[in-house]
From Swiss-Prot:
Binding site for L-glutamine: 54, 354, 382-385, 405, 462
Family listed: Belongs to the CTP synthase family.
Name recorded for this polypeptide: CTP synthase
Stretches assigned to the Glutamine amidotransferase type-1 domain: 292-534
Organism: Bacillus pumilus (strain SAFR-032)
GO biological processes: 'de novo' CTP biosynthetic process; pyrimidine nucleobase biosynthetic process
Keyword Cell inner membrane among UniProt keywords: no
Gene assigned in the entry: pyrG
Location of the region described as Amidoligase domain in the Swiss-Prot/TrEMBL record: 1-267
One cellular-component annotation, GO: cytosol
Protein backbone atom coordinates (compact mmCIF):
# COMPACT_ATOMS: atom_id res chain seq x y z
CA UNK A 1 0.00 0.00 0.00
CA UNK A 2 1.15 3.52 -0.78
CA UNK A 3 2.43 5.49 2.22
CA UNK A 4 1.76 9.21 2.69
CA UNK A 5 4.05 11.76 4.38
CA UNK A 6 2.88 15.31 5.06
CA UNK A 7 5.30 18.19 5.68
CA UNK A 8 3.82 21.20 7.46
CA UNK A 9 5.36 24.43 8.71
CA UNK A 10 5.00 26.65 11.74
CA UNK A 11 6.18 29.92 13.31
CA UNK A 12 7.14 31.63 10.01
CA UNK A 13 7.06 30.86 6.29
CA UNK A 14 10.13 30.24 4.11
CA UNK A 15 11.59 27.82 6.65
CA UNK A 16 12.70 25.32 4.04
CA UNK A 17 9.78 22.88 4.07
CA UNK A 18 10.40 22.28 0.38
CA UNK A 19 14.08 21.46 0.91
CA UNK A 20 13.17 19.17 3.83
CA UNK A 21 10.59 17.36 1.71
CA UNK A 22 12.96 17.11 -1.27
CA UNK A 23 15.82 15.86 0.92
CA UNK A 24 13.63 13.17 2.47
CA UNK A 25 12.53 12.16 -1.02
CA UNK A 26 16.17 11.76 -2.03
CA UNK A 27 16.92 9.60 1.02
CA UNK A 28 13.91 7.34 0.46
CA UNK A 29 14.69 7.02 -3.25
CA UNK A 30 18.23 5.93 -2.38
CA UNK A 31 16.70 3.33 -0.07
CA UNK A 32 15.07 1.79 -3.13
CA UNK A 33 11.65 3.39 -2.73
CA UNK A 34 9.63 4.73 -5.67
CA UNK A 35 8.89 8.28 -4.51
CA UNK A 36 6.67 11.06 -5.81
CA UNK A 37 6.12 14.46 -4.25
CA UNK A 38 3.60 17.29 -4.45
CA UNK A 39 2.97 20.80 -3.12
CA UNK A 40 -0.36 22.14 -1.87
CA UNK A 41 -0.57 25.94 -2.09
CA UNK A 42 -3.40 27.58 -0.11
CA UNK A 43 -3.79 30.64 -2.36
CA UNK A 44 -6.96 31.03 -4.43
CA UNK A 45 -5.18 31.48 -7.78
CA UNK A 46 -5.65 28.40 -9.97
CA UNK A 47 -1.90 28.33 -10.57
CA UNK A 48 1.02 30.79 -10.34
CA UNK A 49 1.14 31.30 -14.10
CA UNK A 50 -0.39 34.77 -14.01
CA UNK A 51 1.19 35.85 -10.71
CA UNK A 52 3.95 38.43 -10.54
CA UNK A 53 7.39 36.96 -9.83
CA UNK A 54 7.63 39.53 -7.04
CA UNK A 55 4.67 37.80 -5.40
CA UNK A 56 5.62 34.22 -6.05
CA UNK A 57 9.09 33.85 -7.49
CA UNK A 58 9.76 31.60 -10.44
CA UNK A 59 7.02 29.68 -12.24
CA UNK A 60 8.34 26.14 -12.73
CA UNK A 61 7.03 24.28 -15.80
CA UNK A 62 6.65 20.49 -15.87
CA UNK A 63 6.89 18.16 -18.86
CA UNK A 64 3.10 18.09 -19.26
CA UNK A 65 2.88 21.88 -19.24
CA UNK A 66 1.72 22.62 -15.71
CA UNK A 67 2.74 26.05 -14.37
CA UNK A 68 3.75 25.33 -10.79
CA UNK A 69 5.43 26.48 -7.59
CA UNK A 70 9.21 26.91 -7.57
CA UNK A 71 9.49 24.18 -4.91
CA UNK A 72 8.81 21.65 -7.67
CA UNK A 73 12.17 22.66 -9.09
CA UNK A 74 13.81 21.69 -5.80
CA UNK A 75 11.90 18.40 -5.83
CA UNK A 76 13.03 17.53 -9.35
CA UNK A 77 16.64 18.55 -8.79
CA UNK A 78 17.00 16.70 -5.48
CA UNK A 79 15.07 13.51 -6.27
CA UNK A 80 15.90 13.45 -10.01
CA UNK A 81 12.34 12.78 -11.14
CA UNK A 82 10.05 14.50 -13.64
CA UNK A 83 6.84 15.67 -12.00
CA UNK A 84 3.45 16.43 -13.55
CA UNK A 85 0.25 18.45 -13.12
CA UNK A 86 -0.77 16.36 -10.10
CA UNK A 87 2.28 17.64 -8.22
CA UNK A 88 0.97 21.15 -7.55
CA UNK A 89 -2.51 21.77 -6.18
CA UNK A 90 -3.96 25.13 -5.14
CA UNK A 91 -7.09 26.21 -3.31
CA UNK A 92 -8.18 27.72 -6.61
CA UNK A 93 -7.95 24.35 -8.38
CA UNK A 94 -9.82 22.57 -5.59
CA UNK A 95 -12.70 25.06 -5.48
CA UNK A 96 -12.86 25.27 -9.27
CA UNK A 97 -13.28 21.49 -9.51
CA UNK A 98 -15.89 21.35 -6.75
CA UNK A 99 -17.90 24.20 -8.29
CA UNK A 100 -17.87 22.50 -11.72
CA UNK A 101 -19.17 19.31 -10.10
CA UNK A 102 -21.91 21.29 -8.35
CA UNK A 103 -22.96 22.91 -11.64
CA UNK A 104 -23.12 19.49 -13.30
CA UNK A 105 -25.34 18.21 -10.52
CA UNK A 106 -22.81 15.67 -9.25
CA UNK A 107 -23.82 16.36 -5.64
CA UNK A 108 -27.48 15.54 -6.37
CA UNK A 109 -28.85 18.74 -4.90
CA UNK A 110 -26.92 18.49 -1.64
CA UNK A 111 -25.48 21.46 0.21
CA UNK A 112 -21.84 21.82 -0.85
CA UNK A 113 -19.61 22.44 2.16
CA UNK A 114 -15.94 22.67 3.09
CA UNK A 115 -16.38 19.39 4.95
CA UNK A 116 -16.81 16.94 3.28
CA UNK A 117 -16.74 18.23 -0.30
CA UNK A 118 -13.62 20.42 -0.29
CA UNK A 119 -11.69 18.09 2.02
CA UNK A 120 -12.67 15.06 -0.08
CA UNK A 121 -11.39 16.78 -3.21
CA UNK A 122 -8.11 17.55 -1.43
CA UNK A 123 -7.74 13.92 -0.34
CA UNK A 124 -8.52 12.78 -3.87
CA UNK A 125 -5.59 14.88 -5.17
CA UNK A 126 -3.26 13.21 -2.66
CA UNK A 127 -4.43 9.71 -3.58
CA UNK A 128 -4.30 10.52 -7.29
CA UNK A 129 -0.61 11.48 -7.06
CA UNK A 130 0.15 7.97 -5.79
CA UNK A 131 -2.19 6.25 -8.24
CA UNK A 132 -0.93 8.06 -11.34
CA UNK A 133 2.73 7.33 -10.56
CA UNK A 134 2.47 3.98 -8.75
CA UNK A 135 4.76 5.39 -6.05
CA UNK A 136 5.55 3.56 -2.83
CA UNK A 137 5.65 6.88 -0.96
CA UNK A 138 3.88 10.19 -1.64
CA UNK A 139 5.38 13.23 0.09
CA UNK A 140 3.06 16.24 0.29
CA UNK A 141 4.21 19.68 1.38
CA UNK A 142 1.45 21.90 2.77
CA UNK A 143 2.25 25.51 1.89
CA UNK A 144 1.90 28.36 4.32
CA UNK A 145 2.01 28.20 8.09
CA UNK A 146 -0.12 26.38 10.66
CA UNK A 147 -2.64 28.92 11.92
CA UNK A 148 -3.30 30.49 8.50
CA UNK A 149 -7.01 30.53 7.66
CA UNK A 150 -6.23 29.46 4.08
CA UNK A 151 -4.50 26.25 5.21
CA UNK A 152 -7.31 24.90 7.41
CA UNK A 153 -9.11 22.75 4.78
CA UNK A 154 -5.81 21.12 3.79
CA UNK A 155 -4.87 20.36 7.39
CA UNK A 156 -8.33 18.93 8.07
CA UNK A 157 -8.08 16.73 4.98
CA UNK A 158 -4.71 15.27 5.94
CA UNK A 159 -5.96 14.78 9.51
CA UNK A 160 -8.81 12.65 8.18
CA UNK A 161 -6.44 10.46 6.18
CA UNK A 162 -4.97 9.02 9.38
CA UNK A 163 -8.37 7.47 10.15
CA UNK A 164 -9.18 6.67 6.52
CA UNK A 165 -6.14 4.51 5.75
CA UNK A 166 -4.49 3.81 9.12
CA UNK A 167 -1.90 5.49 11.30
CA UNK A 168 0.97 3.35 10.00
CA UNK A 169 0.30 4.60 6.45
CA UNK A 170 0.39 8.32 7.31
CA UNK A 171 3.19 10.40 8.83
CA UNK A 172 3.34 14.06 9.82
CA UNK A 173 6.60 16.06 9.78
CA UNK A 174 6.42 19.57 11.19
CA UNK A 175 9.09 22.18 10.34
CA UNK A 176 9.55 24.98 12.86
CA UNK A 177 11.97 27.73 13.82
CA UNK A 178 14.07 28.02 16.97
CA UNK A 179 15.15 31.66 16.78
CA UNK A 180 18.45 32.90 18.16
CA UNK A 181 18.08 36.03 20.30
CA UNK A 182 21.42 37.78 19.88
CA UNK A 183 20.95 40.22 22.76
CA UNK A 184 20.44 37.31 25.16
CA UNK A 185 22.75 34.91 23.34
CA UNK A 186 20.06 32.22 23.52
CA UNK A 187 17.99 29.95 21.31
CA UNK A 188 14.28 29.97 22.17
CA UNK A 189 12.03 26.89 21.87
CA UNK A 190 8.76 28.60 22.86
CA UNK A 191 7.67 29.42 19.27
CA UNK A 192 8.08 25.73 18.36
CA UNK A 193 6.04 24.66 21.39
CA UNK A 194 3.20 27.02 20.45
CA UNK A 195 3.30 25.97 16.79
CA UNK A 196 2.94 22.30 17.72
CA UNK A 197 0.19 23.21 20.19
CA UNK A 198 -1.68 24.91 17.34
CA UNK A 199 -1.20 21.88 15.10
CA UNK A 200 -2.41 19.50 17.80
CA UNK A 201 -5.50 21.65 18.34
CA UNK A 202 -6.38 20.79 14.73
CA UNK A 203 -6.09 17.08 15.44
CA UNK A 204 -2.60 16.47 14.06
CA UNK A 205 0.16 15.13 16.30
CA UNK A 206 3.51 15.45 14.50
CA UNK A 207 5.65 12.32 14.38
CA UNK A 208 8.82 14.30 13.66
CA UNK A 209 9.78 17.93 14.27
CA UNK A 210 12.46 19.40 12.00
CA UNK A 211 13.90 22.45 13.72
CA UNK A 212 15.45 25.22 11.61
CA UNK A 213 18.16 27.09 13.51
CA UNK A 214 21.19 29.22 12.77
CA UNK A 215 23.07 28.05 15.90
CA UNK A 216 23.73 24.52 17.24
CA UNK A 217 21.14 23.16 19.67
CA UNK A 218 22.03 21.43 22.94
CA UNK A 219 20.66 18.03 23.86
CA UNK A 220 18.73 19.68 26.70
CA UNK A 221 16.89 21.83 24.19
CA UNK A 222 15.95 18.81 22.10
CA UNK A 223 14.75 17.04 25.24
CA UNK A 224 12.65 20.08 26.13
CA UNK A 225 11.01 20.19 22.69
CA UNK A 226 10.34 16.45 22.87
CA UNK A 227 8.76 16.78 26.33
CA UNK A 228 6.46 19.69 25.52
CA UNK A 229 5.55 18.41 22.04
CA UNK A 230 5.00 14.78 23.10
CA UNK A 231 7.43 13.08 20.72
CA UNK A 232 10.60 10.99 21.10
CA UNK A 233 13.82 12.95 21.50
CA UNK A 234 15.28 11.16 18.47
CA UNK A 235 12.37 12.59 16.45
CA UNK A 236 13.61 16.15 17.05
CA UNK A 237 15.76 16.78 13.98
CA UNK A 238 18.06 19.79 13.89
CA UNK A 239 18.51 21.60 10.58
CA UNK A 240 21.17 24.30 10.77
CA UNK A 241 21.81 26.86 8.06
CA UNK A 242 24.08 25.24 5.45
CA UNK A 243 26.67 26.48 2.96
CA UNK A 244 24.97 24.48 0.21
CA UNK A 245 21.43 23.14 -0.03
CA UNK A 246 22.77 19.84 -1.31
CA UNK A 247 24.30 18.99 2.07
CA UNK A 248 20.87 18.92 3.75
CA UNK A 249 20.00 15.30 2.79
CA UNK A 250 23.27 14.12 4.35
CA UNK A 251 22.62 16.13 7.53
CA UNK A 252 19.12 14.65 7.83
CA UNK A 253 20.44 11.14 7.19
CA UNK A 254 23.03 11.49 9.96
CA UNK A 255 20.21 12.28 12.39
CA UNK A 256 18.18 9.30 11.19
CA UNK A 257 15.19 11.00 9.57
CA UNK A 258 14.81 8.36 6.87
CA UNK A 259 15.17 5.60 9.48
CA UNK A 260 12.38 7.16 11.57
CA UNK A 261 10.13 7.21 8.51
CA UNK A 262 10.85 3.58 7.64
CA UNK A 263 10.25 2.44 11.23
CA UNK A 264 6.97 4.33 11.59
CA UNK A 265 5.63 3.15 8.26
CA UNK A 266 7.01 -0.37 8.57
CA UNK A 267 8.91 -0.03 5.31
CA UNK A 268 11.25 -2.93 4.68
CA UNK A 269 13.99 -1.26 2.65
CA UNK A 270 17.75 -1.11 2.30
CA UNK A 271 19.97 1.58 3.80
CA UNK A 272 20.35 4.68 1.64
CA UNK A 273 23.53 4.59 -0.44
CA UNK A 274 24.52 8.26 -0.59
CA UNK A 275 27.99 7.73 -2.08
CA UNK A 276 27.30 9.74 -5.25
CA UNK A 277 25.56 12.49 -3.29
CA UNK A 278 28.41 12.69 -0.78
CA UNK A 279 30.86 13.05 -3.67
CA UNK A 280 28.70 15.86 -5.09
CA UNK A 281 28.67 17.77 -1.78
CA UNK A 282 32.42 17.28 -1.36
CA UNK A 283 32.96 18.72 -4.85
CA UNK A 284 30.62 21.66 -4.21
CA UNK A 285 32.44 22.55 -0.99
CA UNK A 286 35.91 22.36 -2.55
CA UNK A 287 35.66 24.09 -5.93
CA UNK A 288 39.05 25.39 -7.09
CA UNK A 289 38.04 27.83 -9.86
CA UNK A 290 35.69 30.78 -10.12
CA UNK A 291 33.70 32.33 -12.94
CA UNK A 292 31.38 35.34 -12.85
CA UNK A 293 28.17 35.47 -14.88
CA UNK A 294 26.24 38.70 -15.35
CA UNK A 295 22.50 37.98 -15.13
CA UNK A 296 20.54 40.77 -16.81
CA UNK A 297 16.96 40.64 -15.58
CA UNK A 298 13.98 42.74 -14.56
CA UNK A 299 13.19 40.90 -11.29
CA UNK A 300 16.68 40.90 -9.79
CA UNK A 301 15.45 42.32 -6.47
CA UNK A 302 13.81 38.92 -5.85
CA UNK A 303 16.38 36.33 -6.80
CA UNK A 304 13.87 33.47 -6.40
CA UNK A 305 12.43 34.68 -9.72
CA UNK A 306 15.47 33.11 -11.41
CA UNK A 307 16.16 30.23 -9.02
CA UNK A 308 16.31 27.46 -11.66
CA UNK A 309 18.60 29.58 -13.86
CA UNK A 310 20.96 30.17 -10.94
CA UNK A 311 20.96 26.49 -9.92
CA UNK A 312 21.59 25.43 -13.53
CA UNK A 313 24.57 27.77 -13.74
CA UNK A 314 25.94 26.28 -10.53
CA UNK A 315 25.42 22.72 -11.80
CA UNK A 316 27.33 23.65 -14.94
CA UNK A 317 30.13 25.07 -12.82
CA UNK A 318 30.47 21.80 -10.91
CA UNK A 319 31.37 20.08 -14.19
CA UNK A 320 34.42 22.38 -14.46
CA UNK A 321 35.31 22.45 -10.74
CA UNK A 322 34.19 26.09 -10.80
CA UNK A 323 32.22 28.22 -8.38
CA UNK A 324 29.77 30.31 -10.41
CA UNK A 325 29.30 33.79 -8.98
CA UNK A 326 26.22 35.73 -10.10
CA UNK A 327 26.41 39.46 -10.74
CA UNK A 328 22.83 40.72 -10.66
CA UNK A 329 22.26 43.44 -13.28
CA UNK A 330 18.96 45.32 -13.29
CA UNK A 331 17.94 45.61 -16.94
CA UNK A 332 16.12 48.87 -16.24
CA UNK A 333 19.40 50.49 -15.19
CA UNK A 334 21.36 49.41 -18.28
CA UNK A 335 22.20 52.04 -20.88
CA UNK A 336 24.58 52.15 -23.83
CA UNK A 337 26.80 54.43 -21.75
CA UNK A 338 27.09 52.25 -18.63
CA UNK A 339 26.91 48.69 -19.98
CA UNK A 340 30.69 48.43 -20.16
CA UNK A 341 30.87 49.27 -16.46
CA UNK A 342 28.33 46.57 -15.62
CA UNK A 343 30.25 44.03 -17.72
CA UNK A 344 33.71 44.98 -16.48
CA UNK A 345 34.08 42.02 -14.11
CA UNK A 346 31.86 39.41 -15.78
CA UNK A 347 33.02 36.46 -17.88
CA UNK A 348 29.67 35.70 -19.50
CA UNK A 349 26.24 37.31 -19.87
CA UNK A 350 22.89 35.55 -19.52
CA UNK A 351 19.50 37.10 -20.33
CA UNK A 352 16.70 34.93 -18.92
CA UNK A 353 12.97 34.98 -19.62
CA UNK A 354 10.35 37.54 -18.66
CA UNK A 355 7.16 39.22 -19.82
CA UNK A 356 6.24 42.83 -20.60
CA UNK A 357 8.16 45.85 -21.84
CA UNK A 358 9.93 46.88 -18.63
CA UNK A 359 13.69 46.44 -18.95
CA UNK A 360 13.59 45.15 -22.53
CA UNK A 361 15.76 47.94 -23.97
CA UNK A 362 18.38 47.26 -21.28
CA UNK A 363 18.41 43.60 -22.25
CA UNK A 364 18.85 44.53 -25.91
CA UNK A 365 21.81 46.77 -25.02
CA UNK A 366 23.39 44.00 -22.92
CA UNK A 367 22.95 41.57 -25.82
CA UNK A 368 24.56 44.01 -28.25
CA UNK A 369 27.50 44.45 -25.87
CA UNK A 370 28.01 40.67 -25.64
CA UNK A 371 27.82 40.27 -29.42
CA UNK A 372 30.18 43.12 -30.29
CA UNK A 373 32.70 42.42 -27.52
CA UNK A 374 32.77 38.62 -27.98
CA UNK A 375 31.52 37.98 -24.44
CA UNK A 376 29.94 34.50 -24.07
CA UNK A 377 26.17 35.01 -24.24
CA UNK A 378 23.18 32.83 -23.40
CA UNK A 379 19.60 33.99 -23.95
CA UNK A 380 16.52 32.16 -22.70
CA UNK A 381 12.96 32.68 -24.02
CA UNK A 382 12.71 36.51 -24.03
CA UNK A 383 16.52 36.37 -24.15
CA UNK A 384 16.31 34.72 -27.58
CA UNK A 385 13.76 37.25 -28.71
CA UNK A 386 15.87 40.28 -27.70
CA UNK A 387 18.92 38.69 -29.37
CA UNK A 388 16.92 38.48 -32.61
CA UNK A 389 15.65 42.05 -32.26
CA UNK A 390 19.13 43.39 -31.52
CA UNK A 391 20.59 41.70 -34.61
CA UNK A 392 17.77 43.00 -36.81
CA UNK A 393 18.28 46.56 -35.57
CA UNK A 394 22.06 46.80 -35.48
CA UNK A 395 23.22 44.39 -38.19
CA UNK A 396 20.36 44.43 -40.71
CA UNK A 397 19.61 48.10 -40.03
CA UNK A 398 15.89 47.55 -39.48
CA UNK A 399 15.30 50.64 -37.36
CA UNK A 400 12.53 50.20 -34.80
CA UNK A 401 12.51 46.41 -35.12
CA UNK A 402 10.78 44.93 -32.11
CA UNK A 403 8.43 42.32 -30.73
CA UNK A 404 4.72 42.69 -31.42
CA UNK A 405 4.23 42.02 -27.71
CA UNK A 406 6.15 45.17 -26.78
CA UNK A 407 5.40 47.40 -29.78
CA UNK A 408 2.29 46.27 -31.70
CA UNK A 409 2.81 49.09 -34.24
CA UNK A 410 6.41 48.23 -35.19
CA UNK A 411 7.13 48.09 -38.92
CA UNK A 412 9.45 45.13 -38.33
CA UNK A 413 7.79 42.62 -35.96
CA UNK A 414 10.78 40.29 -35.62
CA UNK A 415 8.87 38.51 -32.86
CA UNK A 416 5.16 37.88 -33.36
CA UNK A 417 2.26 36.05 -31.77
CA UNK A 418 2.08 32.33 -32.45
CA UNK A 419 -0.73 31.70 -34.99
CA UNK A 420 -2.58 29.41 -32.59
CA UNK A 421 -2.56 32.20 -29.96
CA UNK A 422 -4.38 34.84 -32.03
CA UNK A 423 -7.88 33.95 -30.78
CA UNK A 424 -6.87 33.29 -27.17
CA UNK A 425 -8.37 35.68 -24.61
CA UNK A 426 -7.54 34.10 -21.24
CA UNK A 427 -4.05 34.64 -19.84
CA UNK A 428 -3.88 31.67 -17.48
CA UNK A 429 -2.74 28.29 -18.79
CA UNK A 430 -2.92 29.33 -22.46
CA UNK A 431 0.75 29.74 -23.37
CA UNK A 432 2.69 27.17 -25.39
CA UNK A 433 3.59 25.05 -22.39
CA UNK A 434 5.52 21.88 -21.65
CA UNK A 435 7.82 19.48 -23.46
CA UNK A 436 8.31 19.83 -27.23
CA UNK A 437 10.90 18.39 -29.64
CA UNK A 438 13.65 20.46 -31.21
CA UNK A 439 15.60 19.37 -34.29
CA UNK A 440 19.24 20.52 -34.36
CA UNK A 441 21.57 21.37 -37.23
CA UNK A 442 24.68 19.21 -37.02
CA UNK A 443 27.08 22.07 -37.78
CA UNK A 444 26.17 24.11 -34.71
CA UNK A 445 27.13 24.82 -31.12
CA UNK A 446 23.74 23.46 -30.06
CA UNK A 447 24.46 20.08 -31.66
CA UNK A 448 27.94 20.07 -30.14
CA UNK A 449 26.36 20.58 -26.71
CA UNK A 450 23.65 17.93 -26.98
CA UNK A 451 25.38 15.53 -29.40
CA UNK A 452 21.95 14.54 -30.65
CA UNK A 453 19.74 15.37 -33.64
CA UNK A 454 16.45 15.76 -31.74
CA UNK A 455 16.13 16.96 -28.15
CA UNK A 456 13.12 17.66 -25.92
CA UNK A 457 12.87 20.79 -23.78
CA UNK A 458 10.19 22.61 -21.79
CA UNK A 459 8.52 25.76 -23.10
CA UNK A 460 6.53 28.70 -21.75
CA UNK A 461 5.82 31.38 -24.34
CA UNK A 462 3.17 33.00 -26.48
CA UNK A 463 5.40 34.82 -28.99
CA UNK A 464 7.85 33.35 -31.49
CA UNK A 465 10.37 34.41 -34.14
CA UNK A 466 8.57 35.78 -37.21
CA UNK A 467 9.50 33.61 -40.21
CA UNK A 468 8.95 36.52 -42.60
CA UNK A 469 12.39 37.77 -41.52
CA UNK A 470 14.11 34.39 -41.44
CA UNK A 471 15.72 34.42 -44.87
CA UNK A 472 16.89 38.02 -44.46
CA UNK A 473 18.44 37.31 -41.05
CA UNK A 474 20.05 34.10 -42.25
CA UNK A 475 21.64 35.89 -45.19
CA UNK A 476 23.21 38.33 -42.71
CA UNK A 477 24.88 35.53 -40.73
CA UNK A 478 22.20 34.78 -38.14
CA UNK A 479 22.10 31.01 -37.55
CA UNK A 480 18.86 29.14 -36.86
CA UNK A 481 20.39 26.02 -35.38
CA UNK A 482 17.29 24.49 -33.81
CA UNK A 483 13.69 24.36 -35.00
CA UNK A 484 10.54 22.35 -34.43
CA UNK A 485 10.74 19.09 -36.44
CA UNK A 486 8.53 20.59 -39.17
CA UNK A 487 10.87 23.59 -39.39
CA UNK A 488 8.08 26.06 -38.61
CA UNK A 489 9.11 27.31 -35.16
CA UNK A 490 12.55 28.68 -34.34
CA UNK A 491 13.88 27.10 -31.14
CA UNK A 492 17.60 28.02 -31.08
CA UNK A 493 19.62 30.81 -32.66
CA UNK A 494 23.39 31.33 -32.57
CA UNK A 495 26.26 33.21 -34.18
CA UNK A 496 29.22 31.56 -35.91
CA UNK A 497 31.72 34.43 -35.69
CA UNK A 498 31.57 34.51 -31.90
CA UNK A 499 33.22 32.36 -29.19
CA UNK A 500 29.81 31.35 -27.78
CA UNK A 501 26.60 33.20 -28.58
CA UNK A 502 23.44 31.12 -28.36
CA UNK A 503 19.83 31.61 -27.31
CA UNK A 504 16.85 29.29 -26.97
CA UNK A 505 13.11 29.88 -27.06
CA UNK A 506 12.64 27.05 -24.56
CA UNK A 507 13.64 26.99 -20.87
CA UNK A 508 16.58 24.59 -20.43
CA UNK A 509 16.94 25.54 -16.76
CA UNK A 510 13.98 23.33 -15.84
CA UNK A 511 15.77 20.04 -16.58
CA UNK A 512 19.22 20.59 -15.07
CA UNK A 513 20.37 18.34 -12.23
CA UNK A 514 23.28 18.81 -9.78
CA UNK A 515 24.91 15.58 -10.98
CA UNK A 516 23.87 16.07 -14.64
CA UNK A 517 24.12 19.68 -15.85
CA UNK A 518 21.96 20.77 -18.76
CA UNK A 519 24.15 20.74 -21.94
CA UNK A 520 23.63 24.36 -23.03
CA UNK A 521 24.31 25.69 -19.54
CA UNK A 522 27.37 23.46 -19.32
CA UNK A 523 28.87 24.74 -22.56
CA UNK A 524 27.98 28.36 -21.77
CA UNK A 525 29.74 28.20 -18.40
CA UNK A 526 32.64 26.36 -20.04
CA UNK A 527 33.01 29.15 -22.61
CA UNK A 528 32.77 31.79 -19.86
CA UNK A 529 35.44 30.02 -17.83
CA UNK A 530 37.67 29.90 -20.89
CA UNK A 531 37.12 33.63 -21.39
CA UNK A 532 38.00 34.24 -17.75
CA UNK A 533 41.23 32.26 -17.98
CA UNK A 534 42.31 34.08 -21.15
CA UNK A 535 42.00 37.56 -19.61
Amino acid sequence: MTKYIFVTGGVVSSLGKGITAASLGRLLKNRGMDVTIQKFDPYINVDPGTMSPYQHGEVFVTDDGAETDLDLGHYERFIDINLNKYSNVTTGKIYSTVLKKERRGDYLGGTVQVIPHITNEIKDRVYRAGKETGADVVITEIGGTVGDIESLPFLEAIRQMKSDIGRENVMYIHCTLVPYIRAAGELKTKPTQHSVKELRSLGIQPNVIVVRTEMPMTQDMKDKIALFCDIDTKAVIECQDADTLYSIPLDLQKQGLDKLVCEHMKLDCQDADMTEWTALVDKVQNLSKQVTIGLVGKYVELQDAYISVVESLRHAGYAFDADVQIKWINAEEVTAENMADFAQDVDGIIVPGGFGDRGVEGKIIATQYARENKVPFFGICLGMQVASIEYARNVLGLEGAHSAEIDPETAFPIIDLLPEQKDVDDLGGTLRLGLYPCKLNEDSKAFAAYNDEVVYERHRHRYEFNNEFRQQMEAAGFVFSGTSPDGRLVEIIELKDHPWFLASQFHPEFVSRPTRPQPLFRDFVGASLQASESK
